[in-house]
Design a protein with these regions (language model features):
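A short, hydrophobic beta-strand-centered structural micro-motif
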Residues: 216-223, 269-295, 303
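Gly/Ala-rich beta-loop-alpha elbow adjacent to hydrolase catalytic centers
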Residues: 86-90, 94
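Serine hydrolase/lipase
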Residues: 23-29, 36-42, 48-85, 99-217
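Short beta-strand->alpha-helix linker/helix-N-cap micro-motif
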Residues: 242-267
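A structural "domain/chain start" motif
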Residues: 120, 199-251, 352-364
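Short secondary-structure boundary motifs at beta->alpha junctions and helix caps
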Residues: 309-363
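Short, surface-exposed "cap/lid" segments of acyl-processing enzymes
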Residues: 1-31
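Short, surface-exposed coil-to-beta transition loops
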Residues: 299-304, 320
Length: 364
């Protein structure tokens, strides 16, 4: 996204440069050529300069102490597939980067792109000549001005790609370009599509229990506070959390995802111990999602509480992680922060927990 002064410097460098070439030297030479008319493919100069910098960046990609060009792997290995994604400026750069890689010989199906609230990157001639060479899905919403900003204020730009638009309610009008809002909406749509796929038998559900193997068995309860239960997005958060624990625990049983810890008559601790012993579990994991407005301000926070016990009542670890957000936007993103911290803490006490179930995205 456009998070820093340097990002906005890129955004505001709105001159267009000719687009062409099949390698980095050719890209630079082509862009430095004489100014062309609007019938020639041209792109935003700031975005183009940014992408050229990315293509020549040297990084230690394998943690072996050896720096190499960031995209050498995808250029050299035809089995490698990389999803390029970004918000705002990041989305524009991801799109242009994908086309550069295609121009260098990479099949477009190996570099799909998903953008959120991204501006256009080139003129109509560019969209016509190169639009089909990028496997692009653009996510926008009905109130976000950024995707149309270059067309509106400067002219001569055109969007392309498969377009999906979210329809925001009025209460989200202050967050129309916020990535947290896009994250919340995307997860809701993802779960709706996933439910259809599972119902049709196209996709198997993650099992509510996984018993094979020799690692310790963990009985899992996931719930939410009385205050959080009032929010319509909390079911998405709990499902997101459950899926993460299903991925990180080698052996587990999801006992309940509607745990009301505030109801002591139903959820007395002894009942957790009894149920876990019946299941043959070694550990009890209780996760609670809490969210509320602080009394002295209008800030909202999402709090993730994680507790682990042995089945005989011993406390293994108890921790809580919170993040300030809007009451109506950014809640899945805040939950992700809590999960990252909870996962690291869990690993300290339960060595069998898996930390590498997801490949970490690299920020360009």
């Amino acid at each position: 996204g456009s998070a820093s002064k340097s990002d906005w410097t890129v955004n505001l460098n709105t001159d267009k440069v000719p687009y062409g070439g099949s390698d980095l030297a050719g890209f630079i030479e082509y862009a430095e050529g004489p100014e062309k008319d609007k019938t020639v493919p041209m792109v935003h100069k700031g975005f183009n300069d940014y992408v050229n910098t990315v293509l020549e960046t040297m990084v230690d990609t394998n943690d072996d102490g050896i720096d190499e060009v960031l995209f050498n792997e995808i250029l050299a290995n035809t089995d490698t597939r990389v999803l390029l994604t970004g918000h705002s400026l990041g989305g524009a750069v991801a799109t242009l980067l994908a086309e550069r890689l295609v121009s260098m010989g990479v099949d477009k199906n190996r570099v799909p792109v998903i953008t959120f609230g991204a501006p256009a990157i080139g003129n109509a001639a560019f969209a016509e000549a190169y639009g089909d060479s990028v496997d692009l899905r653009r996510i926008t919403n009905n109130a976000d001005p950024v995707p149309g900003s270059l067309q509106t204020f400067f002219g001569g730009y055109k969007q392309f790609g498969k377009h999906h638009k979210y329809n925001l309610s009025r209460k989200l009008s202050d967050f129309q370009h916020d990535m947290g809002m896009y994250f919340d909406y995307s997860m809701r749509e993802y779960y709706a599509a996933l439910d259809k796929a599972e119902a049709a038998g196209v996709r198997e559900k993650l099992p509510l229990q996984k018993l094979e193997g020799s690692d310790p068995l963990v009985a899992v309860w996931i719930g939410s506070s009385r205050e959080a239960d009032k929010r319509d997005y909390v079911p998405d958060i709990k499902r997101f959390v459950m899926n993460e624990y299903q991925m990180m625990l080698p052996r587990y049983v999801i006992v309940d995802t509607e745990t009301k810890l505030y109801d002591d008559s139903v959820y007395a601790m002894e009942k957790f111990y009894q149920k876990a012993r019946e299941l043959g579990a070694d550990y009890i994991l209780i996760v609670e999602i809490d969210g509320r407005v602080l009394n002295d301000c209008e800030k909202w926070y999402i709090n993730m509480n994680q507790s682990v016990f042995t089945v005989d009542g011993g406390l293994v670890t108890m921790n809580s992680f919170a993040r300030f957000v809007s009451p109506v936007s950014g809640n899945i993103q805040a939950t992700t922060f809590g999960l990252e911290q909870s996962r690291e803490e869990l690993k300290k006490h339960l060595p069998f927990v898996k930390l590498d179930q997801h490949a970490s995205p690299r920020r360009l």
